Amino acid sequence: MSQKRKLLPAALGLLSLASLSVTAADTLSLQGKTIGVAVVGTQHFWDREAFKGATEEVEKLGGKVIGVDGGRDNQVHANNHDILLSRKVDAVISILGDSAVEPKFKALRDAGIPVFTVDHVSQYSVNNTTSDNYTLGSTIGRYMADELGGKGNVAVFNAFSSALRICGIRYDQWKYVLKDYPDIHIIQPELAEQFANSP
């Protein structure tokens, strides 16, 4: 059998799969479904845009959204998941949060409600969508070091590295890269904004 004849069935199979994927995407619908969208707070641009993007996508797919905002208080954010559980939503998208949400995620899962997380790794989540925080931190470190020509003093605003895993990863990777630049010094003490219920 010639090489062309061997490749033809494979090519036709891939073409069929591709057309099925397009058809499935065209008919994807949340019609008749209610999706809870919980965010730790909408005070920050990224958080607000993630919340907005999630709610708009659910609505675009025909679903109804029940949105809850924790007002930047992790306990309020966690408790908001009880509201979604009592409303018997079909699924929950949860954006950020700390360990206080874990028992809430478990309760949702036990009730048969899937939880999808954003920037929060959880054993109870079906899926976690997150940035590559390791690459972000190291890239920022290399970029900054290059821009400084490998020497200088740096003031660091480090409010959340111990409170938010994603910030901690970025900070740790940034600092790790700086080990290769002994002439770059971090001004002490590091700057940090302190406020109630941070982050």
Task: List where the protein language model places each region.
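A residue-level marker of the well-folded mature domains of exported/periplasmic proteins
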Residues: 3, 24-199
